[in-house]
A protein has these predicted regions:
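Hydrophobic, well-ordered secondary-structure elements that form the walls
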Residues: 656, 712, 828
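Core alpha-helical transmembrane segments of integral membrane proteins
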Residues: 677-770
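Conserved structured core elements
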Residues: 637, 702, 706, 744, ...
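Membrane-proximal N-terminal segments immediately preceding the first transmembrane helix
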Residues: 673-686, 786-798
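Short, well-ordered loop/turn and helix-capping segments at boundaries between secondary-structure elements
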Residues: 649, 665, 717-718, 834
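N-terminal leader/targeting and pre-domain segments
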Residues: 1-681
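Membrane-interface segments at loop-to-transmembrane junctions
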Residues: 732-743, 808, 812, 840-844
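Pore domain of cation channels
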Residues: 764-842
């Protein structure tokens, strides 16, 4: 049996829709329905008082004892503030295409479910709300048809709320409030910016935020660093999905700090705007499923489907610091704009967050982090100290931060791959990609990549250096990449170039492969605005899979103390032409790598030659581009040692020796030696011994010089400048039949030359023949034999110069012979071999 509460006097007489609502309750009692539904008729009175709805929900329905499950009101205008603070409802509320003149207050209420389908409302205050079912604040038409969206002028407050089902805001249009303001209306000065739903451009809205400064007449941000919030839901708990999908649109911050989502956070196709602030803040959030910030159908979309596959768009800073996503972090097809990259950005009083397009420091992703497809970021994307359970995918992405840091992944740990790959389009960036101290489990794949330096540096980086603003210094390239080079300045003025693009991955640990293929710097022809760098100092990888052309693209690279175990291009990856002689091909391959190393670490040597490999021909850089002091500063031996070690492990000892010989040659030139030491080292160890790898050279030089000397000695003998020694003359006068006399030793010019050159070996020539000037005034005939240790012999020759050239030649041969034989012995034994590569991966020099 049903009982009906008496209508309070304040509602007498009831309005038209109020009467229909009471009649629907009576009808449900008679027909035993569990739904109470009414719909306004256009042209009639569509108003219904909020206080009446409160009495109806908390008084009439409980008193009737009818098991009503849902109350649905369509097309009505709710007049006044609907206050349900602390209420415990037993029915699910549904307002479809209704217009509220004041906010709804659901603070600390408990409801089975709550639905706002289409319509308009100033604000929703529902802190600590408990919803045993789902909370739906969504458009009536999922396709976003005009007139079916839900418009909320102010903010939705759900701090500490609990939703047992889904929280669905598909197609909702949210305005914003000041975070510290408890009212629902924004200030009149900025209300048209955040609370209107006209299709104004972001630039127009940004300009509308600015007001004149009374002191200097300039324009500064009207927000003054204050936080504008569209959804304030710190500590929100949602057991199901949280959906803000297309055509969702918010003009303030979606604040989800510390929230817990049991399934997915889906923002596919959403548009978020908060110039100078956060568009989304989910710091410390816990998401058990996947977080989507892309397009609804990115896996099957291309540019031809752009109209029906909208991108996620964020104009401001999206923040995920410290968040944990158990599934994927999927930003594929997303479009992120930092405030500093929007037209009209104010450089008078900027904020630090103006440079961030996406900030996810310390984020933990259980599966893949995807930034693929049509993903584009205008500003800095930072994943500092992030943890990725599988792959970090930037396939076909575009990262724009001209001359500054477009991507910061310092300290990141990726269990799978880092993919900088081209798909339907190349991976493109005009900024720097940082992976300092990163830990990559399966490798970095950089293939089909374009680094563009055609445009000017970003205004933010120019502002940072012109004003020395320390807030933006972190977004500039490291000082290690600055260049003092006339190639990058006008009229050959040597200025410091503080902008660059490329990859900066010092001390990165790559367990798998580092792939560097099909990489190009743009523009290919013309004058770039800033250099293209590849900085891998101290990094390590198991395998390097590359092509020579890609290494030749960067203007500068640094692989000092870089460690790797193998080069995939030696056998599998490097494809030789059919019928090509493999030893010659290997020699050409290694020569090309040496030329690349010389361009970076021996630049003055590389200036005199061109790098050629197949169809590749790079002209030498002008000599004025690098001074000797700069060449000495840039020289580093470790890259040569590492290459030699890898070649030797691969069984290419001959090529490894060539690399080490080139290293020692460069060490002689750029090791900081003074010019006499350079000349002496270059002649003795370089020319005569090839730094220990040409040990036959001293013997060959000795034989060649012996041949030249033999000609000179033969001429001297014919002119009687070389005569027998005194005991050899006695043998001439002795009787030949006397057995006690030694036999006569005839003169032999080649043997005499060798006898003067080779030490510690007696060939019976220099003991039996002497230079004629040495037999007068210095040695008394018949008294003693000639001794090479007698200093008077040399002083006599010096006093008789220059007509004693044959004697000078003998002295030179003596010293030269000692030098050549010592070098020969040192080369054979390996004592004088230079550039010994380590047996294990070096830790650095």
């Amino acid at each position: 049996m049903s009982y009906f509460a008496r209508l309070p006097e304040q509602f007498v007489p009831p309005l038209l829709l109020e009467t229909e609502l009471l009649n629907a309750l009576y009808g449900a009692a008679r027909q035993q329905h569990d739904d109470v539904e009414i719909a306004a008729t256009p042209g009639e009175d569509v108003a219904i008082r909020a206080t009446f709805i409160r009495w109806f929900l908390l008084g009439a329905i409980p008193a009737s004892q009818i098991p009503i499950a849902r109350v649905r009101i369509t097309g009505a205008t709710i007049d006044g503030v609907l206050v349900l603070r602390g209420a415990r409802l037993i029915v699910r509320l549904c307002f479809q295409l209704c217009r509220f003149t004041a906010p709804i207050d659901l603070t600390e209420a408990t409801v089975p479910g709550f639905e706002l389908i289409g319509g308009a409302i100033p604000a929703i205050h529902a802190d600590r709300l408990t919803v045993r079912g789902s909370l739906l604040i969504r458009a009536a038409d999922p396709a976003g048809k005009d007139g079916t969206e839900i418009k909320i002028a102010g903010a939705i407050r759900l701090n500490g709320a609990t939703i047992r089902g889904n929280f669905d805001m598909q197609g909702a249009h949210l305005g914003a409030e000041l975070a510290e303001q408890r009212g629902y209306l924004a200030p009149l000065a900025v209300a048209p910016v955040y609370c209107s739903h006209d299709p104004a451009t972001p630039e127009a809205r940004l300009a509308a935020q600015r007001r004149p400064n009374a002191e200097d007449g300039t324009r500064e941000p009207a927000i003054d660093g204050r936080a504008w919030v569209a959804l304030e839901a710190d500590g929100l708990s949602v057991d199901g999905h949280l959906r803000c999908v297309w055509p969702f649109h918010a003009k303030g911050e979606l604040r989800l700090d510390g929230c817990r989502i049991g399934r997915n956070l889906d923002c596919a196709g959403a548009r978020l705007e908060n110039f100078g602030g956060y568009t989304l803040s989910a710091a410390g959030a816990r998401i058990a499923g996947t977080a989507y910030f892309g397009s609804p159908f990115h896996e099957h979309a291309d540019d031809s489907h752009h109209g029906r596959n909208p991108q996620f768009v964020s104009r401001g800073t999206a923040r995920l610091d410290g968040a944990r996503v158990e599934g994927d972090l999927d930003c594929s097809d997303g479009c992120f704009f930092a405030t500093a990259f929007l037209t009209g950005w104010n450089t008078v009083s900027p904020f630090e967050n103006d440079a961030y397009a996406l900030r996810a420091n310390g984020v933990e992703v259980g599966a893949n982090a995807r930034f693929a497809g049509r993903f584009i970021a205008h500003g800095n994307v930072t994943l500092l100290n992030a943890r990725i359970g599988r792959d970090l995918d930037f396939t076909s992405a575009r990262l724009e931060f001209a001359g500054g840091e477009a991507l910061c992944c310092d300290g990141i740990a990726v269990a799978g791959l880092v993919m900088l790959l081209g798909g339907q389009r190349p991976f493109w960036t005009n900024g720097l990609l940082r992976f300092v101290l990163a830990s990559i489990g399966q490798g970095i794949y950089a293939e089909n990549v374009r680094f563009d330096r055609s445009g000017p540096p970003a205004p933010l980086t120019q502002h940072a250096f012109l004003t020395e603003d320390k807030r933006f210094a972190k977004f500039a390239v490291p000082s290690e990449l600055w260049l003092t080079d006339p190639l990058w300045t006008a009229h050959d003025r040597k200025e410091i170039v503080r902008h660059a693009c490329g990859i900066y991955a010092d001390d990165a640990a790559i367990t798998g492969s580092f792939i560097w293929r099909d990489v190009a710097g743009e523009p290919a022809n013309g004058s770039p605005s800033y250099p293209f760098w590849l900085h891998l100092s101290g990094a390590s990888a198991e395998t390097v899979d590359d092509d020579i052309k890609s290494w030749a693209e960067p203007d500068r690279f640094d692989i000092a103390n870089c460690r790797y175990r193998s080069l995939a291009g030696l056998f599998e990856g490097y494809r030789f032409d059919e019928g090509e002689d493999h030893p010659k091909a290997f020699a050409s391959y290694v020569k090309s790598r040496l030329s690349l190393l010389d361009r970076e670490y021996a630049p003055r040597r590389a200036e005199r030659s061109s790098l050629k490999l197949g169809g590749l021909a790079l002209p030498p850089r002008p000599r004025k581009a690098c001074s000797r002091y700069e060449a000495i500063r840039r020289f580093k031996p470790q890259p040569y040692l590492q290459l030699a070690r890898v070649l030797r492990i691969a069984g290419m000892d001959k090529e490894a020796n060539k690399v080490l010989a080139r290293l020692e040659s460069n060490r002689t030139r750029y090791g900081g030696f003074y010019w006499p030491n350079r000349l002496l080292r270059g002649f003795t160890f370089g020319f005569l011994l090839n730094y220990g790898f040409g040990w036959p050279r001293p013997a060959i030089v000795l034989l060649i010089w012996a041949s030249i000397s033999s000609v000179a000695f033969q001429i001297a003998r014919s002119q009687h400048l070389i005569e027998p020694t005194w005991h050899n003359k006695e043998n001439l006068a002795a009787k030949p039949d006397r057995e006690s006399n030694p036999p006569y030793v005839p003169f032999n010019a080649p043997i005499f030359a060798l006898d003067t050159l080779v030490p510690l070996v007696n060939l019976d020539q220099k003991e039996n023949w002497e230079v004629e000037p040495m037999s007068h005034h210095m040695v008394e005939a018949g008294t003693r034999p000639f001794s090479w240790r007698d200093y008077r012999t040399y002083s006599g020759l010096l006093s008789s110069a220059p007509d004693r050239l044959v004697g000078w030649l003998i002295i030179f041969n003596k010293f030269f012979g000692w030098l050549l034989t010592s070098l020969f012995a040192g080369g054979v034994t390996g004592l004088l071999r230079g550039g010994r590569e380590p047996a294990e991966l070096p830790g650095g020099e």
